[in-house]
């Protein structure tokens, strides 16, 4: 069973996926249609609108359900 995501773990997931795609914050922000400052806030787990988080997930091609399952299985959490 997947553990629930919180703001900080979701931010880390986004940051890890961005880095694994070899994207800078500037480029990722542009692809997602947000400012670099906003992307940084999301990656830090700070408060933002949920619509902004979905915009970033979509822009980076992250499926939150499979990402959460993959992340928890990698860490050995079932």
Swiss-Prot record:
Occurrences of domain HTH cro/C1-type (ranges): 14-67
Residue ranges of DNA binding: 25-44
PROSITE patterns per UniProt: HTH_CROC1
Cross-referenced SMART domains: HTH_XRE
UniProt keywords, alphabetically: DNA-binding, Repressor, Toxin-antitoxin system, Transcription, Transcription regulation
Molecular functions (GO terms): DNA binding
Induction: Expressed in late-exponential phase; part of the hipBA operon.
Lineage top rank: taxon: Bacteria
Acetylation found in the keyword field: no
Keyword Cell cycle: no
UniProt note: phenotype after gene disruption: Essential; a single hipB deletion cannot be made, probably due to toxicity of HipA.
Pfam families (UniProt xref): HTH_3
Disulfide linkage: none
Record SUPFAM superfamilies: lambda repressor-like DNA-binding domains (SSF47413)
Family: Belongs to the HipB antitoxin family.
Function: Antitoxin component of a type II toxin-antitoxin (TA) system. Neutralizes the toxic effect of cognate toxin HipA; overexpression in wild-type or a hipAB deletion temporarily inhibits cell growth. Binds operator DNA; in the ternary phosphoserine-HipA-HipB-DNA complex the DNA is bent about 125 degrees.
Assembly and binders: Homodimer, binds DNA. Forms a HipA(2)HipB(2)-DNA complex with cognate toxin HipA; has higher affinity for the latter when HipB is prebound to DNA and HipA is phosphorylated.
Listed name of the protein: Antitoxin HipB
Source lineage: Bacteria, Pseudomonadati, Pseudomonadota, Gammaproteobacteria, Alteromonadales
């Amino acid at each position: 069973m997947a553990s629930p995501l919180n703001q900080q773990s979701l931010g880390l997931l986004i940051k890890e996926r961005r880095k694994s795609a070899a994207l800078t914050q500037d480029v990722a922000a542009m692809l997602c249609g947000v400012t670099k400052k906003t992307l940084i806030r999301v990656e830090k787990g700070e408060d933002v609108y949920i619509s902004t988080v979905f915009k970033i997930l979509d822009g980076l091609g992250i499926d939150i359900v499979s990402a959460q399952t993959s992340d928890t299985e990698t860490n050995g959490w079932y």
